[in-house]
């Protein structure tokens, strides 16, 4: 699936057939060490996920997909009006940040592999005048403190 030598011939590739947003945080994190976000197809998929059967909120699925090359892998007829509006808003927002995500520099802030229950990364424009920060909760928490992230803007 992922072949660095084929990037001159193809615009994007699938990191995996697994579109479970929680697992994609880990997969896209590792893949980002070798491949740019513009090449990583990252789609919003259905819930429950058809591979893991996990139910993940639409907003979380959108946020994970927006950290790569955003796409939709979801049936519109299966969505509520509110879900369609959320996706419409997300696509409009992605168009605003797309150049930063797809052509910017990546900074890995908190690795999902550090077992802190969160992951975070940031893209900055080459001029360093724009930034996009992603932060994902990776586990369900019951009265636990989450890792505190401070970002200077």
Q: Where does each model-flagged region fall?
A:
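Carbohydrate-binding surface patches
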Residues: 113-152
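Short, Lys/Arg-enriched charge-dense amphipathic segments
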Residues: 9-27, 99-106, 123-138
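Short, low-complexity, polar/charged sequence segments that are solvent-exposed and flexible
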Residues: 10-14, 84, 151-152
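Catalytic cores of secreted or luminal carbohydrate-active enzymes
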Residues: 59-111
């Amino acid at each position: 699936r992922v072949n660095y030598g084929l990037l001159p011939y193809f615009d994007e590739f699938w990191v995996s057939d697994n579109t479970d947003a929680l697992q994609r945080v880990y997969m896209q994190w590792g893949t980002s060490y070798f491949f740019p976000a513009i090449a990583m197809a990252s789609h919003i998929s259905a819930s429950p996920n058809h591979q893991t059967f996990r139910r993940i909120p639409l907003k979380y699925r959108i946020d994970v997909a927006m950290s790569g090359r955003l796409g939709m892998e979801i049936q519109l007829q299966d969505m509520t009006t509110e879900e369609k509006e959320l996706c419409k808003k997300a696509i409009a927002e992605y168009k605003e940040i797309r150049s930063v995500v797809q052509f910017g520099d990546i900074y890995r802030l908190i690795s999902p592999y550090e077992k802190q229950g969160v992951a975070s990364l940031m893209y900055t424009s080459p001029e360093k005048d724009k930034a996009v920060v992603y932060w994902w909760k990776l586990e369900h928490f019951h009265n636990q403190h989450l890792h505190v992230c401070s970002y200077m803007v």
